[in-house]
Amino acid sequence: MAMKIGTDAFKERVSQGIDNEFMRGAVSGAQERLRTRRLEAAEELGNWEEWRSLSEEIRQHVLENLDFYLGQLAENVAKRGGHVYFAKTAEEASSYIRDVIQKKNGKKIVKSKSMVTEEINLNEVLEKEGCEVVETDLGEYILQIDDHDPPSHIVAPALHKNKEQIRDVFKERLDYQHTEKPEELVMHARAILRKKFLEADIGITGCNFAIADTGSVSLVTNEGNGRLVSTLPKTQITVMGMERIVPSFSEFEVLVSMLTRSAVGQRLTSYITALTGPKLEGEVDGPEEFHLVIVDNGRSNILGTEFQSVLQCIRCAACINVCPVYRHVGGHSYGSIYSGPIGAVLSPLLGGYDDYKELPYASSLCAACSEACPVKIPLHELLLKHRQNIVEKEGRAPISEKLAMKAFGLGASSLSLYKMGSKWAPAAMTPFTEDEKISKGPGPLKNWTQIRDFPAPHKSRFRDWFADRETSERTKEEQ
């Protein structure tokens, strides 16, 4: 699965999301639960704003010294017997991983949850080579067996499905014969996945944070699949975005606490795993061979720009969980594996404005996302910068918008035109007016007035009322 999901136009995706009542209900309920848990976890920690500032400082420091820490990480991974590959593009990353698997004659692959492997379209590349690739995160596994349904949330990828829908998928794909009880569904999936773990030749994981001074990679999970993926297969491949790095375990401790509290409202997740190279002589667990693939794929182009702060992201989805737009349209409406406010900022940077020029406008600019972000990314400000670039640098504003703004500028800068427009506006809008409201607006007002009240122009203008009042006052004074 590549970063881009679906081929429908943005407006069509949004309409589909709005029409999906179950999805909107599920998203709204999940947002409320996760928001409440996050606030409780933040209050329990205490001094939340100070923790946010510290986390921001750590991420900013890493980005400003990224060359050094990437070099240190690569050196320490190599010292411990691992292999490091820097991939400039998604194609380079996928090709390297494919070559490693072919050299090991690997055919059965298990994966833990990883957004960057979806970004580089890894599963499709490996499946074309005849490999069996199994997602072992339960949410991702559900989506995979359901015809590779795209994720709709960074942390909870199957958020858009209910237990009845999951039961039906299991019945059709896994010969499931039980009820929709979550416990029964999980036990059935667990039995299948356990066998896959034991049969796998290759394990592929993502990386929440790489620790530069030890050459370690970390996995933060609640299901334990990350440990099985990284210890049972003989060859482990970890794939990470180049910015997902911390100097030492001291900084890791801070960020992982912020990640778990912001993502799911937990002090810590059930499993926090740090892996350092292949197993040593005499060790029982762990891979015999370890590869770390560090992916650029457009990230270096963001460094040093006005958008650099977006690379501070720790993928907690706190911004998604408070976003009113996401609540109404869902994750698939964004057309990217990165949804919500972070996706609206990041997707155009990694995928370009051709595919994602609408996303910066999918925001009310309420700044709830910026307030929720544990590393203080000013997301609403970055969305505005995107809009500015789209109009001024890219020249991609719709023709209708350009004409409307030009007409407004012309009318607002000419007193005679402004007077004429305000005088004739009530008459011009009469066919669209009902009960002093525009009920069926023309042009761009049509969608607005279908679900909102838009006041009709008043028949008497303020300037006329004010002039009449002044005349009346002068008359009284003269009398």
Curated annotation (Swiss-Prot):
PROSITE patterns on file: 4FE4S_FER_1 (PS00198)
Induction, per UniProt: Is under the dual control of the transcriptional repressors LutR and SinR, which allows the lutABC operon to be induced during both growth in liquid culture and biofilm formation. Is induced by L-lactate, which relieves LutR repression.
Keywords of the record: 4Fe-4S, Electron transport, Iron, Iron-sulfur, Metal-binding, Repeat, Transport
GO biological process, one term: lactate catabolic process
Annotated binding of [4Fe-4S] cluster 1, by residue: 313, 316, 319, 373
InterPro entries xref list: 4Fe4S_Fe-S-bd, 4Fe4S_Fe_S_CS, FTHF_cligase-like_sf, Helical_ferredxn, LUD_dom, LutB, LutB/LldF, LutB_C
Observed effect of gene inactivation: Cells lacking this gene are unable to grow on minimal medium with L-lactate as the sole carbon source. Cells lacking the lutABC operon exhibit little or no defect in biofilm formation on MSgg medium, but form small colonies that almost completely lacked surface architecture when glycerol is replaced with L-lactate in the MSgg medium.
Coiled coil: none
GO molecular function: 4 iron, 4 sulfur cluster binding; L-lactate dehydrogenase activity; metal ion binding
Family recorded in the similarity comment: Belongs to the LutB/YkgF family.
Task performed by this protein: Is essential for L-lactate degradation and allows cells to grow with lactate as the sole carbon source. Has probably a role as an electron transporter during oxidation of L-lactate. May also allow cells to utilize an alternative carbon source during biofilm formation, since it contributes to the formation of architecturally complex communities when lactate is present.
Protein name (database record): Lactate utilization protein B
Organism from which the protein derives: Bacillus subtilis (strain 168)
